[in-house]
C-alpha cells in the first residue's frame, strides 16, 4: 500500500526529491500543486516531467481516503465518513463558525482511552492514522470548498475527533507542521487546537516543541474519584500528575489551556462540583479557560443524559463568581449523528447487518 504524499513535510519532500536527482525547486513546484492548486493526481502537475510523475506515482498516492457518507445539518455543520485504504472508517466534521470554517479531524481508528460517556471508545483502537491520512481529511474538506467556487477555506482545525492525539504523537506533530506551513495551507498555529484526555508526559513534550498551537484538556470531572470512574486514563495520570504537567506547559509557553467539561446530568454538574472545579484551576486562573459542553447522548451509554439547563446555568454561575473564564459551548449538528464516533458506529453496524443478511 503506497503512502500518501501528504505525509511529507515540505523539508522532507525536498530531501526526497533531491535524493532522486531533482533540483530543490522541483519539490517546491510539487508542494504548490498539492496545497495551493490542490490537484488530486500527479498527472495534473503540468510542469513536472512525465518521468518524474511516474516516479511519484510509483512512490505515493495523493489522497488515500474515499468518501462513504456525508451528513449536512440545518446549521451548516457537515459530517463526513471516510474509508481508509484498508477499509477502516473514520469521521471528520466541518463546523461553520462566525470566525471561519473549523474542521475536526480524527487521529486513530478507534480509541483506547475508555471514557464511559463517549461513542469513540465503543470500538477499541485498531491502529494509528499516519500523518498523510490526517492531512487528507483537511484536503477533502477544502476540496468541498474549492468545488463550490466561493473563495472559502479551512481556517481553523481542532484535533478532537476519534482517538487520543498524544497517543499518536509523531504523526500528529507532522500533520501540524504540514497544515501550518506558510507555503501551503498556511493555517495559523493559533487557529489550531489539539485536545488530549490527559497524557501528562506528552503534555510536557508538547510544551517543549515550541509551537504556538493551542492545547485543550478533556477534564470532565473535578476530583480523582469521579474522573477515574468516567475516564480510565485518570488511573494512570491522576489530577495531581496532570496539573503538574499543565503548569509546566503554561510556564514554558505562557499559553492558555482550555479545559473541556461535558455536562452529565447529576453526575458531574452539581454546585459542589462546580466549586471543586473552580478550586482545582485556581492557581492557573489567568491562563485557563473552561468550556462547558452539552452532552450528545449515545444509545450505548444510556446511563448518562444531558444536564438540565438550570443545572448548567447554576454550575456556570459558580465558576463565574469564582473568577473562572468560562463559556457554555455552542452546539453544532444536533440534527445529525453529532457525537464523535456515532456515524462511524452506526455505519459499521449497518455494514455488519448487510454481510449477515447475504449469508
From Swiss-Prot:
Among PANTHER family, the record links this protein to: 23S RRNA METHYLTRANSFERASE, RADICAL SAM CORE DOMAIN-CONTAINING PROTEIN
The Gene Ontology terms for molecular function here are: 4 iron, 4 sulfur cluster binding; metal ion binding; rRNA (adenine(2503)-C2-)-methyltransferase activity; rRNA binding; tRNA (adenine(37)-C2)-methyltransferase activity; tRNA binding
- Tell me more from the record: Reaction proceeds by a ping-pong mechanism involving intermediate methylation of a conserved cysteine residue.
Which UniProt keywords are given for this protein, alphabetically ordered? Answer: 4Fe-4S, Cytoplasm, Disulfide bond, Iron, Iron-sulfur, Metal-binding, Methyltransferase, rRNA processing, S-adenosyl-L-methionine, Transferase, tRNA processing
* Active-site residues, as the UniProt record annotates them: 91 (proton acceptor), 340 (s-methylcysteine intermediate)
Q: List the disulfide bonds.
A: 104-340
CDD domains tied to this protein: Radical_SAM
Q: What is this protein called?
A: Probable dual-specificity RNA methyltransferase RlmN
Q: Which organism is it from?
A: Streptococcus pyogenes serotype M12 (strain MGAS2096)
Q: Identify the gene encoding this protein.
A: rlmN
Amino acid at each position: 500500500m503506497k503512502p500518501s504524499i501528504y505525509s511529507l513535510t515540505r523539508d522532507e519532500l525536498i530531501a526526497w526529491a533531491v535524493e532522486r536527482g531533482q533540483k530543490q525547486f522541483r519539490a517546491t513546484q510539487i508542494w504548490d500543486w498539492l496545497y495551493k492548486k490542490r490537484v488530486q493526481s500527479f498527472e495534473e502537475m503540468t510542469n513536472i516531467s512525465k518521468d518524474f510523475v511516474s516516479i511519484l506515482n510509483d512512490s505515493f498516492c495523493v489522497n488515500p481516503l474515499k468518501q462513504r457518507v456525508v451528513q449536512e445539518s440545518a446549521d451548516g455543520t457537515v459530517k463526513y465518513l471516510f474509508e481508509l485504504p484498508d477499509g477502516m472508517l473514520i469521521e471528520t466534521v466541518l463546523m461553520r463558525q462566525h470566525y471561519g470554517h473549523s474542521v475536526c479531524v480524527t487521529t486513530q481508528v478507534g480509541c483506547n482511552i475508555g471514557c464511559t460517556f463517549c461513542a469513540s471508545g465503543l470500538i477499541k483502537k485498531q491502529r494509528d492514522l499516519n500523518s498523510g491520512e490526517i492531512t487528507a481529511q483537511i484536503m477533502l474538506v477544502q476540496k468541498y470548498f474549492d468545488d463550490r467556487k466561493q473563495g472559502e477555506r479551512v481556517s481553523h482545525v481542532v484535533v478532537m475527533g476519534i482517538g487520543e492525539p498524544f497517543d499518536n504523537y509523531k504523526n500528529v506533530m507532522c500533520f501540524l507542521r504540514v497544515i501550518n506551513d506558510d507555503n501551503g495551507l498556511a493555517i495559523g498555529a493559533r487557529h489550531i487546537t489539539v485536545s488530549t484526555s490527559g497524557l501528562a508526559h506528552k503534555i510536557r513534550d508538547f510544551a517543549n516543541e515550541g509551537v504556538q498551537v493551542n492545547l485543550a484538556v478533556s477534564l470532565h470531572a473535578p476530583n480523582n474519584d469521579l474522573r477515574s470512574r468516567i475516564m480510565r486514563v485518570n488511573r494512570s495520570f491522576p489530577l495531581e500528575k496532570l496539573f503538574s504537567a499543565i503548569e509546566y506547559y503554561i510556564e514554558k509557553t505562557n499559553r492558555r489551556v482550555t479545559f473541556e467539561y461535558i455536562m452529565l446530568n447529576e453526575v458531574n454538574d452539581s454546585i459542589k462540583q462546580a466549586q471543586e472545579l473552580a478550586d482545582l484551576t485556581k492557581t492557573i486562573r489567568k491562563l485557563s479557560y473552561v468550556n462547558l459542553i452539552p452532552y450528545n447522548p449515545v444509545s450505548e451509554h444510556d446511563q448518562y443524559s444531558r444536564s438540565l439547563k438550570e443545572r448548567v446555568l447554576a454550575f456556570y454561575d459558580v465558576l463565574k463568581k469564582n473568577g473562572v473564564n468560562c463559556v457554555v459551548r455552542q452546539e453544532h449538528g444536533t440534527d445529525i449523528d453529532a457525537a464523535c464516533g456515532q456515524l462511524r458506529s452506526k455505519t459499521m453496524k449497518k455494514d455488519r447487518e448487510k454481510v449477515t443478511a447475504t449469508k
